[in-house]
Amino acid sequence: MQLSLSDVLNISLQNMDVVRILTGVSATTTGRTVYDTAITNAGIDVARGAFDPSFNVNNSWLENRTPGAVPDPIDPTQTQILGTRNDRHALILGLSKRMVTGGVIDFGVIGSNNRFPDLITPLNPQIGSSAAVQLTQPLLQGAGTRVNQAPIVIARIDTERSYFQFKDAVQSHVQSVIQGYWQLVLARTELWAREQQVEQLEFALRRAEDRVEIGDARLGDLSQARVAYENFRAILLAAQANILQRESALRNVLGLNPYDNDRIIPTSPLIDEKVEILWEQLLSLAETNRPDIVELKLILEADQQRQLIRNNDALPRLDAVALYRWNGLEGTMPNGNPIRADGFDDWSLGVNFSVPIGLRASRALLRQQELLIQRDRVNLEQGLHQASHDLAISVRNLELFYSQYRRYQEVRKAAQENLDQQSEIGNELESFIVLLQAVVDWGNAVANEAQALVLYNAELAVLERETGTILETHGITFVEERFGSIGPLGRLAVPVAYPAATPATGLIERYPSTDQPSEQQLNLRDPLQRYEDNEDNAEDLPSPGPNVESDDPSRTSSRNSAVIRGKGVSHQRSSSSGILETLKNWLR
């Protein structure tokens, strides 16, 4: 199936629940998934839960029968064991709320109903009740809105860190897909070059066999040709295996099956124009957009929030406490009349102070946090420093690969000219070693030209990756998906929508598609096509017989020994026996 690079990237985004990156001829997972950010996001509600009100109710019923020994009023020498019964109902209700200032406000209600069936008491039943409001406000340790909201801020920073870690992994994935695509183009180009080399040496081998048969060459020449031919067949086998490995690696990183009925045929043309580099703008983009740099900044912000907490923990504990309570009592008098009284209110104010002598542990943690911030700052500086060097390496590589591409174009022209010269077959015996070297140089020149251009295109993706803009330049964005789950109101309420996944989406149309494989951009034509054309013209001429006179036997030999080059033994334009018969007729 013919696929452009845009098609391949779109397929990869559709299958990217788990982020994969290319590692050689395989692909491995980065450990990042589309659910990571949503999982971390739950920590925000966990931190906010510290300020949720707490409600408690204790409701109890008690029947108490307490035995007791008393002297017998009739016989003092005897003792009676009597019991009293007490029926009691108690209700304790409390509501507590922590405030962002660090204070805690408590509201409580206590109610009790006591009955004494076997006793005569002033009130039976006796109902007591009280309601109280208490405020505890820290003045030193635990005081302040910033320090109390710091855990929420840290949780939000952790969510942002998770997002940028996922974004960094997606950037590596996109770069891997682009690299794997161009590596497949390179493998297909190298396979074509090796096939051409094998076909050229196959003809040289057949020619050597014909010459040995007519006694025009030594067996050593034939052995040399056969060794070279078999060596290049082995190289061709490696090239065929390499293209399968590269396609398998690309399928792996795309999330496709390793085998199906379709072969991937790249159709996007390679970029062969030099890209202008603006160094200062590249540095500015990297400082602003690189996910790893942003993550280092977020780590510094999170540790600064932790320093607020550590600094507050190193303070003594000093709390102001205020209480106001309403008390009430009612019941039934022995005469059966009810009685009720209220207005018995009380209040209290106080200050509670506590401090560990020395505050050794809390101050050690504060000192540790201060050093962590210093470490974060130097790590951020090192990250910026390393980013600038990574950009410099990428820029130098771009310049190198493009220069190599232009140079290898000249090398290929020279190798083609050399192969043309060495492939001229006349009546004289050419040096097979020279021809072999020409074939090797030509194949290497084609492969090197393709490799330089592929490396140049892959390095363009690396440059975008180093600046942190590879997703933006390809039109890739992130969409937050949501799912319904139990919320603060409980299971009986309507489920609340929470973040579920953050997949990368977008319709990439950056890379055009052609109707030919990508490697055809490298002008992959038959290196000896003109000799095949000469052979076609030679087949239309009459072959010299035994009675044909020739003023220049070498010219006749050259005409009848025109280069025959096919796609294999069964595809040669004339068989070895035909060449042999022609040569025998001329030698007569």
Predicted regions and their residues:
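Regulatory alphaC helix of protein kinase catalytic domains
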Residues: 1-19, 23
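A glycine-/polar-enriched beta->alpha junction
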Residues: 16-34, 38-54, 82, 92-122, ...
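Amphipathic alpha-helical coiled-coil segments
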Residues: 29, 34-47, 169-194, 203, ...
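Transmembrane beta-barrel architecture of outer-membrane proteins
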Residues: 39, 88-90, 128-130, 179, ...
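Transmembrane beta-barrel strands of outer-membrane/channel proteins
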Residues: 55-63, 107-113, 320-326
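Acidic, low-complexity, intrinsically disordered peripheral segments
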Residues: 63-65, 250, 257-261, 265-279, ...
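Short sequence motifs at beta-strands and strand-loop junctions characteristic
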Residues: 83-87, 125-127, 276, 341-345, ...
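Hydrophobic, small-residue-rich alpha-helical packing segments that form membrane-like cores
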Residues: 107, 127-235, 239-255
